Amino acid sequence: MKKVLAIILGGGAGTRLYPLTKLRAKPAVPVAGKYRLIDIPVSNCINSEIFKIYVLTQFNSASLNRHIARTYNFSGFSEGFVEVLAAQQTPENPNWFQGTADAVRQYLWMLQEWDVDEFLILSGDHLYRMDYRLFIQRHRETNADITLSVIPIDDRRASDFGLMKIDNSGRVIDFSEKPKGEALTKMRVDTTVLGLTPEQAASQPYIASMGIYVFKKDVLIKLLKESLERTDFGKEIIPDASKDHNVQAYLFDDYWEDIGTIEAFYNANLALTQQPMPPFSFYDEEAPIYTRARYLPPTKLLDCHVTESIIGEGCILKNCRIQHSVLGVRSRIETGCVIEESLLMGADFYQASVERQCSIDKGDIPVGIGPDTIIRRAIIDKNARIGHDVKIINKDNVQEADRESQGFYIRSGIVVVLKNAVITDGTII
Protein backbone atom coordinates (compact mmCIF):
# COMPACT_ATOMS: atom_id res chain seq x y z
CA MET A 1 0.00 0.00 0.00
CA LYS A 2 3.05 2.28 -0.17
CA LYS A 3 1.96 3.15 -3.70
CA VAL A 4 -1.41 4.58 -2.57
CA LEU A 5 -2.16 8.17 -1.51
CA ALA A 6 -5.44 8.81 0.36
CA ILE A 7 -7.37 12.06 -0.11
CA ILE A 8 -10.22 12.66 2.37
CA LEU A 9 -12.77 15.23 1.19
CA GLY A 10 -13.78 17.41 4.12
CA GLY A 11 -16.94 18.58 2.39
CA GLY A 12 -18.39 22.04 1.92
CA ALA A 13 -19.89 24.39 4.46
CA GLY A 14 -21.73 21.51 6.15
CA THR A 15 -25.12 23.16 5.77
CA ARG A 16 -26.96 19.85 6.24
CA LEU A 17 -25.21 19.33 9.59
CA TYR A 18 -25.64 22.94 10.72
CA PRO A 19 -25.54 24.10 13.56
CA LEU A 20 -23.00 21.38 14.53
CA THR A 21 -20.78 22.89 11.81
CA LYS A 22 -21.24 26.50 12.97
CA LEU A 23 -17.83 26.60 14.68
CA ARG A 24 -16.07 23.58 13.15
CA ALA A 25 -15.42 21.80 9.86
CA LYS A 26 -17.68 18.84 9.15
CA PRO A 27 -14.90 16.22 9.70
CA ALA A 28 -14.30 17.69 13.17
CA VAL A 29 -17.88 17.05 14.40
CA PRO A 30 -17.77 14.84 17.55
CA VAL A 31 -19.30 11.37 17.26
CA ALA A 32 -19.97 8.46 19.65
CA GLY A 33 -18.91 10.25 22.82
CA LYS A 34 -15.17 10.62 22.20
CA TYR A 35 -14.31 10.46 18.49
CA ARG A 36 -14.57 12.90 15.59
CA LEU A 37 -15.88 12.07 12.11
CA ILE A 38 -12.40 12.36 10.59
CA ASP A 39 -11.16 9.53 12.85
CA ILE A 40 -13.18 7.00 10.83
CA PRO A 41 -11.58 7.33 7.36
CA VAL A 42 -8.13 8.02 8.86
CA SER A 43 -8.36 4.89 11.06
CA ASN A 44 -9.53 2.83 8.08
CA CYS A 45 -6.47 4.06 6.16
CA ILE A 46 -4.05 3.24 9.00
CA ASN A 47 -5.59 -0.23 9.48
CA SER A 48 -5.24 -0.76 5.71
CA GLU A 49 -1.54 0.21 5.86
CA ILE A 50 -2.10 3.45 3.93
CA PHE A 51 -0.05 6.12 5.69
CA LYS A 52 0.00 9.01 3.19
CA ILE A 53 -3.20 10.90 3.96
CA TYR A 54 -4.37 14.39 2.98
CA VAL A 55 -7.59 15.99 4.26
CA LEU A 56 -9.06 18.70 2.00
CA THR A 57 -11.23 21.31 3.71
CA GLN A 58 -12.24 24.95 3.34
CA PHE A 59 -14.48 25.92 6.27
CA ASN A 60 -13.70 26.40 10.00
CA SER A 61 -10.53 24.30 9.87
CA ALA A 62 -8.97 25.32 13.21
CA SER A 63 -10.35 22.55 15.45
CA LEU A 64 -9.77 19.95 12.71
CA ASN A 65 -6.12 21.02 12.37
CA ARG A 66 -5.68 20.86 16.14
CA HIS A 67 -7.25 17.40 16.43
CA ILE A 68 -5.15 15.93 13.61
CA ALA A 69 -1.91 17.47 14.90
CA ARG A 70 -2.53 16.04 18.39
CA THR A 71 -3.72 12.61 17.23
CA TYR A 72 -1.88 11.43 14.13
CA ASN A 73 1.73 12.29 14.75
CA PHE A 74 3.64 9.53 12.94
CA SER A 75 7.26 8.96 13.91
CA GLY A 76 9.97 10.83 12.06
CA PHE A 77 11.34 7.48 10.89
CA SER A 78 8.37 6.75 8.62
CA GLU A 79 7.10 8.66 5.62
CA GLY A 80 3.52 8.55 6.92
CA PHE A 81 1.53 11.73 7.57
CA VAL A 82 -1.98 13.08 8.00
CA GLU A 83 -2.09 16.66 6.74
CA VAL A 84 -4.89 19.18 6.28
CA LEU A 85 -4.93 21.13 3.00
CA ALA A 86 -7.26 24.12 3.33
CA ALA A 87 -8.73 25.90 0.32
CA GLN A 88 -6.61 28.87 -0.69
CA GLN A 89 -6.77 31.64 -3.24
CA THR A 90 -3.78 32.06 -5.56
CA PRO A 91 -2.97 34.49 -8.40
CA GLU A 92 -3.73 31.65 -10.87
CA ASN A 93 -6.96 30.63 -9.15
CA PRO A 94 -8.86 33.23 -7.08
CA ASN A 95 -11.76 30.82 -6.37
CA TRP A 96 -12.50 28.58 -3.39
CA PHE A 97 -13.22 24.87 -3.98
CA GLN A 98 -16.18 24.60 -6.38
CA GLY A 99 -16.86 20.88 -5.75
CA THR A 100 -15.25 17.57 -4.83
CA ALA A 101 -13.24 17.23 -8.04
CA ASP A 102 -12.26 20.89 -8.04
CA ALA A 103 -10.88 20.51 -4.50
CA VAL A 104 -8.51 17.79 -5.73
CA ARG A 105 -7.73 19.74 -8.92
CA GLN A 106 -6.60 22.81 -6.98
CA TYR A 107 -3.97 20.73 -5.16
CA LEU A 108 -3.03 18.58 -8.14
CA TRP A 109 0.29 20.42 -8.48
CA MET A 110 1.31 18.93 -5.14
CA LEU A 111 -0.48 15.55 -5.30
CA GLN A 112 1.05 14.58 -8.66
CA GLU A 113 4.58 14.90 -7.23
CA TRP A 114 4.07 11.75 -5.15
CA ASP A 115 5.49 8.48 -6.48
CA VAL A 116 2.25 6.50 -6.18
CA ASP A 117 0.13 4.35 -8.51
CA GLU A 118 -3.34 5.14 -7.12
CA PHE A 119 -5.26 7.95 -5.47
CA LEU A 120 -7.89 6.77 -2.95
CA ILE A 121 -10.68 9.37 -2.64
CA LEU A 122 -12.70 9.19 0.60
CA SER A 123 -15.50 11.15 2.24
CA GLY A 124 -15.28 12.68 5.70
CA ASP A 125 -18.87 12.12 6.88
CA HIS A 126 -19.46 8.35 6.69
CA LEU A 127 -19.65 5.77 9.48
CA TYR A 128 -18.20 2.38 8.46
CA ARG A 129 -15.19 0.09 8.84
CA MET A 130 -13.48 -1.00 5.62
CA ASP A 131 -10.26 -2.71 4.61
CA TYR A 132 -9.17 -0.62 1.63
CA ARG A 133 -6.55 -3.25 0.74
CA LEU A 134 -9.28 -5.54 -0.65
CA PHE A 135 -10.79 -2.61 -2.54
CA ILE A 136 -7.46 -1.65 -4.13
CA GLN A 137 -6.60 -5.30 -4.84
CA ARG A 138 -9.84 -5.63 -6.84
CA HIS A 139 -9.00 -2.39 -8.66
CA ARG A 140 -5.61 -3.77 -9.70
CA GLU A 141 -6.88 -7.24 -10.62
CA THR A 142 -9.47 -5.83 -13.04
CA ASN A 143 -6.97 -3.30 -14.43
CA ALA A 144 -9.60 -0.64 -13.78
CA ASP A 145 -9.03 3.05 -14.45
CA ILE A 146 -11.50 3.87 -11.67
CA THR A 147 -13.18 1.62 -9.08
CA LEU A 148 -16.23 2.72 -7.10
CA SER A 149 -17.23 1.17 -3.80
CA VAL A 150 -20.96 0.40 -4.00
CA ILE A 151 -23.84 -0.87 -1.87
CA PRO A 152 -27.26 -2.23 -2.87
CA ILE A 153 -30.02 0.14 -1.80
CA ASP A 154 -33.83 0.29 -1.54
CA ASP A 155 -36.41 2.56 -3.22
CA ARG A 156 -36.78 4.88 -0.23
CA ARG A 157 -33.18 6.13 -0.20
CA ALA A 158 -32.13 5.57 -3.82
CA SER A 159 -32.66 9.15 -5.03
CA ASP A 160 -30.15 10.44 -2.43
CA PHE A 161 -27.25 8.63 -4.11
CA GLY A 162 -25.38 8.29 -7.37
CA LEU A 163 -26.81 5.14 -9.01
CA MET A 164 -25.27 2.90 -11.65
CA LYS A 165 -25.81 -0.07 -13.93
CA ILE A 166 -23.09 -2.68 -14.34
CA ASP A 167 -22.43 -5.58 -16.70
CA ASN A 168 -21.60 -9.16 -15.67
CA SER A 169 -17.92 -8.34 -15.25
CA GLY A 170 -18.69 -5.57 -12.75
CA ARG A 171 -17.96 -2.78 -15.23
CA VAL A 172 -20.06 0.38 -14.83
CA ILE A 173 -21.98 1.05 -18.06
CA ASP A 174 -24.35 3.80 -16.88
CA PHE A 175 -24.18 6.30 -14.00
CA SER A 176 -26.74 8.85 -12.79
CA GLU A 177 -26.24 11.22 -9.82
CA LYS A 178 -29.30 11.45 -7.50
CA PRO A 179 -31.96 10.73 -10.16
CA LYS A 180 -35.64 11.46 -9.51
CA GLY A 181 -38.93 10.22 -11.00
CA GLU A 182 -38.63 8.44 -14.33
CA ALA A 183 -34.83 8.78 -14.36
CA LEU A 184 -34.79 6.89 -11.05
CA THR A 185 -36.96 4.05 -12.40
CA LYS A 186 -34.56 3.63 -15.33
CA MET A 187 -31.71 2.88 -12.91
CA ARG A 188 -33.40 -0.21 -11.40
CA VAL A 189 -31.29 -3.34 -11.92
CA ASP A 190 -31.16 -6.98 -10.91
CA THR A 191 -28.74 -6.73 -7.98
CA THR A 192 -28.21 -10.51 -7.86
CA VAL A 193 -25.25 -9.66 -10.13
CA LEU A 194 -23.58 -8.35 -6.94
CA GLY A 195 -24.14 -11.67 -5.20
CA LEU A 196 -27.42 -10.83 -3.42
CA THR A 197 -30.12 -13.45 -2.94
CA PRO A 198 -33.30 -13.00 -5.04
CA GLU A 199 -35.14 -11.85 -1.88
CA GLN A 200 -32.49 -9.22 -1.08
CA ALA A 201 -32.35 -8.13 -4.71
CA ALA A 202 -36.12 -7.59 -4.77
CA SER A 203 -35.98 -5.19 -1.80
CA GLN A 204 -32.75 -3.47 -2.92
CA PRO A 205 -33.03 -2.99 -6.69
CA TYR A 206 -30.47 -0.18 -7.04
CA ILE A 207 -26.67 -0.03 -6.97
CA ALA A 208 -25.51 3.09 -5.13
CA SER A 209 -22.10 4.75 -5.03
CA MET A 210 -20.69 5.26 -1.52
CA GLY A 211 -18.60 8.24 -2.64
CA ILE A 212 -15.43 6.16 -2.20
CA TYR A 213 -13.24 5.90 -5.31
CA VAL A 214 -9.81 4.65 -6.32
CA PHE A 215 -8.25 6.16 -9.45
CA LYS A 216 -5.15 5.28 -11.37
CA LYS A 217 -2.90 8.28 -10.79
CA ASP A 218 -2.45 9.18 -14.46
CA VAL A 219 -6.19 8.73 -15.18
CA LEU A 220 -7.23 11.16 -12.43
CA ILE A 221 -4.65 13.74 -13.53
CA LYS A 222 -5.84 13.50 -17.16
CA LEU A 223 -9.55 13.72 -16.26
CA LEU A 224 -9.04 16.76 -14.03
CA LYS A 225 -6.77 18.61 -16.45
CA GLU A 226 -8.74 18.07 -19.64
CA SER A 227 -12.13 19.28 -18.34
CA LEU A 228 -11.70 22.28 -16.04
CA GLU A 229 -15.43 23.02 -16.02
CA ARG A 230 -16.22 19.67 -14.36
CA THR A 231 -16.11 20.29 -10.62
CA ASP A 232 -17.76 17.25 -9.02
CA PHE A 233 -16.83 13.55 -9.07
CA GLY A 234 -20.35 12.15 -8.70
CA LYS A 235 -22.18 14.60 -10.98
CA GLU A 236 -19.65 14.97 -13.81
CA ILE A 237 -16.28 13.17 -13.66
CA ILE A 238 -17.54 9.60 -12.99
CA PRO A 239 -20.56 9.66 -15.40
CA ASP A 240 -18.39 10.98 -18.23
CA ALA A 241 -15.50 8.61 -17.50
CA SER A 242 -17.80 5.56 -17.48
CA LYS A 243 -18.37 6.04 -21.23
CA ASP A 244 -14.76 5.52 -22.33
CA HIS A 245 -12.81 4.21 -19.30
CA ASN A 246 -12.79 0.90 -17.45
CA VAL A 247 -14.87 1.90 -14.40
CA GLN A 248 -15.48 -1.03 -12.04
CA ALA A 249 -17.88 -1.51 -9.11
CA TYR A 250 -16.72 -3.11 -5.84
CA LEU A 251 -19.44 -4.42 -3.51
CA PHE A 252 -19.11 -3.39 0.14
CA ASP A 253 -21.35 -5.68 2.19
CA ASP A 254 -20.96 -4.39 5.74
CA TYR A 255 -22.50 -1.53 7.74
CA TRP A 256 -22.19 1.88 6.06
CA GLU A 257 -24.07 5.06 6.86
CA ASP A 258 -23.88 8.54 5.36
CA ILE A 259 -24.28 10.80 8.41
CA GLY A 260 -24.27 14.12 6.60
CA THR A 261 -27.65 15.32 7.97
CA ILE A 262 -28.74 16.08 11.53
CA GLU A 263 -31.34 13.28 11.51
CA ALA A 264 -28.94 10.65 10.10
CA PHE A 265 -26.19 11.78 12.49
CA TYR A 266 -28.54 11.56 15.50
CA ASN A 267 -29.89 8.13 14.49
CA ALA A 268 -26.42 6.69 13.83
CA ASN A 269 -25.15 7.81 17.24
CA LEU A 270 -28.13 6.42 19.14
CA ALA A 271 -27.98 3.17 17.14
CA LEU A 272 -24.65 2.50 18.88
CA THR A 273 -26.63 1.78 22.08
CA GLN A 274 -28.91 -0.86 20.52
CA GLN A 275 -29.28 -4.23 22.25
CA PRO A 276 -28.18 -6.97 21.90
CA MET A 277 -25.98 -5.98 18.92
CA PRO A 278 -25.56 -2.44 17.60
CA PRO A 279 -25.22 -2.20 13.79
CA PHE A 280 -21.71 -0.72 14.22
CA SER A 281 -19.16 -1.03 17.00
CA PHE A 282 -16.19 1.27 17.50
CA TYR A 283 -14.40 -1.61 19.21
CA ASP A 284 -12.59 -4.08 16.98
CA GLU A 285 -9.28 -5.48 18.14
CA GLU A 286 -8.15 -6.10 14.55
CA ALA A 287 -9.21 -2.69 13.24
CA PRO A 288 -9.65 -0.11 16.01
CA ILE A 289 -10.93 3.42 15.43
CA TYR A 290 -8.23 5.76 16.74
CA THR A 291 -8.66 9.17 18.33
CA ARG A 292 -6.79 11.59 20.56
CA ALA A 293 -5.59 10.16 23.87
CA ARG A 294 -6.95 12.51 26.55
CA TYR A 295 -5.82 10.68 29.73
CA LEU A 296 -9.09 11.39 31.53
CA PRO A 297 -10.11 9.67 34.77
CA PRO A 298 -12.85 7.01 34.76
CA THR A 299 -16.44 8.20 34.84
CA LYS A 300 -18.04 8.68 38.27
CA LEU A 301 -21.66 7.55 38.76
CA LEU A 302 -23.27 8.57 42.04
CA ASP A 303 -26.62 6.83 42.60
CA CYS A 304 -27.65 6.80 38.90
CA HIS A 305 -29.98 4.65 36.84
CA VAL A 306 -28.43 4.07 33.39
CA THR A 307 -29.87 1.83 30.65
CA GLU A 308 -28.84 1.25 27.01
CA SER A 309 -26.37 4.12 26.98
CA ILE A 310 -22.76 4.96 26.15
CA ILE A 311 -20.87 7.18 28.57
CA GLY A 312 -17.48 8.67 27.68
CA GLU A 313 -14.62 8.90 30.14
CA GLY A 314 -14.23 11.69 32.66
CA CYS A 315 -17.97 12.23 33.29
CA ILE A 316 -19.61 13.02 36.64
CA LEU A 317 -23.26 11.93 37.01
CA LYS A 318 -25.25 12.46 40.21
CA ASN A 319 -28.54 10.81 41.11
CA CYS A 320 -29.98 10.97 37.58
CA ARG A 321 -31.67 8.72 35.03
CA ILE A 322 -30.04 8.12 31.62
CA GLN A 323 -31.84 6.05 28.99
CA HIS A 324 -30.88 5.22 25.37
CA SER A 325 -28.39 8.10 25.18
CA VAL A 326 -24.76 8.86 24.32
CA LEU A 327 -22.77 11.08 26.70
CA GLY A 328 -19.48 12.61 25.56
CA VAL A 329 -16.27 13.10 27.54
CA ARG A 330 -16.40 15.34 30.64
CA SER A 331 -20.23 15.40 30.70
CA ARG A 332 -21.56 16.73 33.99
CA ILE A 333 -25.13 15.90 35.01
CA GLU A 334 -26.58 17.08 38.30
CA THR A 335 -29.16 15.61 40.69
CA GLY A 336 -32.68 14.85 39.49
CA CYS A 337 -31.98 15.00 35.74
CA VAL A 338 -33.65 12.74 33.19
CA ILE A 339 -31.85 12.24 29.85
CA GLU A 340 -33.67 10.15 27.23
CA GLU A 341 -32.83 9.41 23.58
CA SER A 342 -30.26 12.19 23.46
CA LEU A 343 -26.70 12.85 22.37
CA LEU A 344 -24.63 14.98 24.75
CA MET A 345 -21.22 15.90 23.35
CA GLY A 346 -19.69 16.75 26.72
CA ALA A 347 -17.11 19.48 27.30
CA ASP A 348 -13.61 20.54 26.23
CA PHE A 349 -12.54 21.37 29.78
CA TYR A 350 -13.31 20.78 33.45
CA GLN A 351 -14.60 23.42 35.82
CA ALA A 352 -13.13 22.87 39.27
CA SER A 353 -15.65 22.58 42.13
CA VAL A 354 -14.60 25.98 43.50
CA GLU A 355 -15.06 27.60 40.09
CA ARG A 356 -18.48 25.98 39.65
CA GLN A 357 -19.61 27.20 43.06
CA CYS A 358 -18.37 30.72 42.30
CA SER A 359 -20.37 30.67 39.05
CA ILE A 360 -23.51 29.61 40.90
CA ASP A 361 -22.97 32.24 43.64
CA LYS A 362 -22.67 34.96 40.98
CA GLY A 363 -25.87 33.76 39.32
CA ASP A 364 -24.03 32.24 36.34
CA ILE A 365 -24.70 28.73 35.03
CA PRO A 366 -21.76 26.28 35.12
CA VAL A 367 -20.89 23.96 32.21
CA GLY A 368 -23.10 20.86 32.16
CA ILE A 369 -26.71 19.94 32.85
CA GLY A 370 -28.25 21.64 35.90
CA PRO A 371 -30.42 19.94 38.57
CA ASP A 372 -33.93 18.62 37.78
CA THR A 373 -33.55 19.13 34.02
CA ILE A 374 -35.30 16.89 31.49
CA ILE A 375 -33.76 16.36 28.03
CA ARG A 376 -35.49 14.19 25.46
CA ARG A 377 -34.65 13.59 21.77
CA ALA A 378 -31.97 16.28 21.60
CA ILE A 379 -28.35 16.94 20.66
CA ILE A 380 -26.44 19.06 23.18
CA ASP A 381 -23.22 20.42 21.67
CA LYS A 382 -20.00 20.89 23.67
CA ASN A 383 -19.61 23.25 26.63
CA ALA A 384 -23.35 24.01 26.82
CA ARG A 385 -24.50 25.51 30.12
CA ILE A 386 -28.00 24.30 30.89
CA GLY A 387 -29.63 25.66 34.02
CA HIS A 388 -31.87 24.34 36.78
CA ASP A 389 -35.29 22.82 35.98
CA VAL A 390 -34.95 23.19 32.19
CA LYS A 391 -37.11 21.08 29.86
CA ILE A 392 -35.70 20.37 26.39
CA ILE A 393 -38.51 18.18 25.09
CA ASN A 394 -39.80 19.95 21.93
CA LYS A 395 -43.13 20.44 23.70
CA ASP A 396 -44.89 21.84 20.61
CA ASN A 397 -43.54 19.07 18.32
CA VAL A 398 -41.93 21.62 15.98
CA GLN A 399 -40.06 20.04 13.03
CA GLU A 400 -37.85 22.95 11.92
CA ALA A 401 -36.90 26.13 13.80
CA ASP A 402 -33.97 28.59 13.85
CA ARG A 403 -33.63 30.14 17.31
CA GLU A 404 -29.93 30.94 17.31
CA SER A 405 -30.38 33.96 19.61
CA GLN A 406 -31.95 31.60 22.17
CA GLY A 407 -29.16 29.04 21.79
CA PHE A 408 -30.85 26.27 19.80
CA TYR A 409 -32.17 25.03 16.47
CA ILE A 410 -34.71 22.31 15.70
CA ARG A 411 -33.97 19.98 12.79
CA SER A 412 -36.31 17.09 11.84
CA GLY A 413 -37.94 17.42 15.27
CA ILE A 414 -34.56 17.11 17.06
CA VAL A 415 -33.59 20.01 19.32
CA VAL A 416 -29.93 20.97 18.75
CA VAL A 417 -28.41 23.15 21.48
CA LEU A 418 -25.45 25.16 20.19
CA LYS A 419 -21.85 24.84 21.32
CA ASN A 420 -21.17 27.19 24.29
CA ALA A 421 -24.91 28.01 24.52
CA VAL A 422 -26.47 29.14 27.80
CA ILE A 423 -30.02 27.93 28.53
CA THR A 424 -31.34 29.77 31.60
CA ASP A 425 -33.14 28.26 34.60
CA GLY A 426 -36.72 27.16 34.02
CA THR A 427 -36.59 27.37 30.21
CA ILE A 428 -39.01 25.09 28.36
CA ILE A 429 -38.20 24.24 24.73
UniProtKB/Swiss-Prot annotation:
Q: Which domain of life does the protein's organism represent? A: Bacteria
Q: Does the keyword Ribosomal protein apply?
A: no
Gene Ontology biological process terms in this record: glycogen biosynthetic process
Question: Pathway involvement?
Answer: Glycan biosynthesis; glycogen biosynthesis
According to the UniProt entry, what is the EC number of this protein?
Answer: 2.7.7.27
One cellular component term from this protein's GO annotations in UniProt:
carboxysome
The UniProt annotation places alpha-D-glucose 1-phosphate binding at G162, E177, K178, S209
**Reactions catalysed, as given in the entry:** alpha-D-glucose 1-phosphate + ATP + H(+) = ADP-alpha-D-glucose + diphosphate
Q: Name one Pfam family in it.
A: LbH_GLGC
Coiled coil ranges = none
Provide the GO MF annotations for this entry: ATP binding; glucose-1-phosphate adenylyltransferase activity; structural constituent of carboxysome shell
Which InterPro entries does the entry link to?
ADP-Glc_PPase, ADP_Glu_pyroP_CS, GlgC_bac, NTP_transferase_dom, Nucleotide-diphossugar_trans, Trimer_LpxA-like_sf
Sorted keywords for this record are: ATP-binding, Carbohydrate metabolism, Glycogen biosynthesis, Glycogen metabolism, Nucleotide-binding, Nucleotidyltransferase, Transferase
Quaternary structure annotation from Swiss-Prot or TrEMBL = Homotetramer.
This molecule's function is given as: Involved in the biosynthesis of ADP-glucose, a building block required for the elongation reactions to produce glycogen. Catalyzes the reaction between ATP and alpha-D-glucose 1-phosphate (G1P) to produce pyrophosphate and ADP-Glc.
Family that this chain belongs to: Belongs to the bacterial/plant glucose-1-phosphate adenylyltransferase family.
This protein is called what?
A: Glucose-1-phosphate adenylyltransferase
Species = Trichormus variabilis (strain ATCC 29413 / PCC 7937)
Encoding gene per record:
glgC
